[in-house]
Amino acid sequence: MESFLNSINQKKIKSEFPMTNNIYDITKNGERLNIEFKETLNRGYHLKKERRQQLASQMKYRMELGDGEAVYFIGVHDDGHLIGLSSEDFEETLFVLKSLAEEVNAEVLDVEKHPAEHGTVGKVLIGRSHDPKNEHLLVGVAGHVDHGKSTLVGTLTTGTLDTGSGGTRIFLDVQKHEIERGLSADLSFAVYGFCNEKVVHLKNPLNNREKSRIVEKCEKVVSFVDTVGHEPWLRTTIRGIVGQKLNYGLLVVDASTGPTHITKEHLGIILAMEMPVIVAVTKIDTATNDRVFEVKDEVFKLLKLVGRIPYMVKSLEDADFVAENMNQHIVPVLKVSAVTGDGLKLLDELFLRLKIPSKEEDLKKPFMMYVDRIYSVTGVGTVVSGTVRQGKVRKGDKVLVGPDATGEFMEVGVKSIEMHHYKKDSGEAGEVVGISITRAKMEDLRRGMVVCNDNYPARAVREFEAEVAILVHPTTIKDGYECITHIETIAETVIFKPLDKEYLSAGDNGRIRMKFKYRPCCIHEGQKLIFREGRSKGFGTVTKIIK
């Protein structure tokens, strides 16, 4: 019994019937509003399917009357008479209540015990869970500048058609210079969801409370990471694709322009990360039917060239089929317009049906997240954000952040956790969260650090080996060559030393010893990496940690 009570969140919640009121004064007036009496419950009967559904519906009704809270008195007869329960029956009844609460996305918040004629009477406060049980799909959006990435996402998440001027991109490009120039300069994040298999749009996408409600209410939440299409900011695009633990890539191609060198570059990054990809041929309202067909054909040829199987999605049945069978090899292609709305319902259907990889194994591992952004919030303090790679972090946890330039990790506390402005008690693998931390200043932190539990095997690595493929290089890569290398959210200058031969050229594969030039980073075997500097580019996998 004590072990169960110790697992309950002990914080007090404001209620019309506070937990400190005299229990007899409340029960003598009978059941009403959010108050329910239960003499005893047992899992053998009350958790059978039909009875469980009835009791879950009853609990949901009581919570609605209590503005999200219900008060259950256990060991109490329907007429309000205090009977009491043995310790075994008390614990069994609590177990059933907890199981029912999980059915309606709620949790047991507090328990009081009071003496009665034949044992103990309990007063149990049940409230909405701060960790809604929903599926979370993370989609990275890539493509050339002006091909309509932000406009498509803005229209998709709001249901508001664009006028043709790209106005819906304002829902994502929130910096003044981005709005004025119509160009995204950093990663942007957007969200929408599905309830009862119906799309839920944001009526006011700039309202943080509305984003919060999407996370709270929807059974499936789709988060978009909108990357940058302008070539000078390619590093930011790489960070968006490599550093966010994405489930799928959405590659956007203008129906008039067709695939460009940037389109091919972004596709290459997505494929290097071994990520399933969807292609949206956008702005079909601005091109002739013949040109749309030509661009579709160009996209198909490009996908086949890199060993993928394009699949044209023309109907809801096609969307259902490809979602059921999609993998790294099959690439659905859709024709869409943010102005006319053509193809948007097919995209909705695809995102609704797409499978989310199981994170069961990741949840068993110690918590770890790579830092993507660092900022200070008035009244909150220092916040780090990123995608949780594995495990689960809870409010109140002690975690490590690092490594710093000397290779050390510092201990900090987790004050609060948010996902799309929705306050949560925890964050888990696959979720994009902001974590408010104590005892750390912004100047002590940098992008590419990890936040992790003390039982995660965090280590400051200076040198490692990788198996790489050189895609493009104007000359040869020799000992001492330097290049920016991306691993997760890390973007650091690395010194190369070929191991199998004296030098590597474009088209070569080989082992390379790499050394972070300025500071150590926390990496491990098996991680994907991309390097790009000037006209040089390649990708690979970390195979061995040296030190």
Where are the language model's segments positioned?
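Polybasic/polar functional segments that serve as interface/processing modules
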Residues: 1-132
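Short glycine-/polar-rich loops that comprise or flank the Walker A/P-loop
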Residues: 32, 70, 244-248, 273-277, ...
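Switch/connector loops and helix/strand junctions flanking conserved nucleotide-binding motifs
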Residues: 83-84, 119, 195, 232, ...
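P-loop NTPase switch module centered on the Walker A-proximal segment
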Residues: 134-234, 244, 249
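Conserved catalytic-core segments of large NTP-driven translation/proteostasis enzymes
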Residues: 138-146, 150, 154-158, 301-458, ...
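C-terminal effector modules of nucleic-acid-centric enzymes and ribosome-associated factors
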Residues: 138-141, 288, 441-547
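Conserved Switch II/interswitch segment of TRAFAC-class P-loop GTPases
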Residues: 220-223, 227-234, 244-265, 274-294
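Active-site glycine-centered loops adjacent to acidic/histidine catalytic or metal-binding residues
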Residues: 282, 337, 534
